[in-house]
């Protein structure tokens, strides 16, 4: 039973570390709801830098 707990904790640590690395790679990109300067800014796939009247934000792009 103790070895199962150790393996489980090791697996969780590996998953958390992998998620943290992907966040570091995306740090320069804007996230949904974050300000952006233009369409040239890096929004996630399926998002565009759109105006909300006051500023530009990464928002879902539902097509043309």
Swiss-Prot record:
The keyword Signal applies. It is found in: Secreted. The presence of a 'disulfide through disulfide knot' structurally defines this protein as a knottin. It comes from Hottentotta judaicus. Keywords: Cardiotoxin, Disulfide bond, Secreted, Signal, Toxin. Its main location: secreted. It comes from the Eukaryota. One of its GO terms (cellular component) is extracellular region. Expressed by the venom gland. This is Phi-buthitoxin-Hj1a. Disulfide bonds join 29-43, 36-49, 42-58. May increase intracellular calcium release through the activation of nuclear inositol 1,4,5-trisphosphate receptors (ITPR) of cardiomyocytes, thereby causing an increase in the contraction frequency of these cells. GO terms for molecular function: toxin activity. Belongs to the scorpion calcin-like family. Residues 1-18 form the signal peptide.
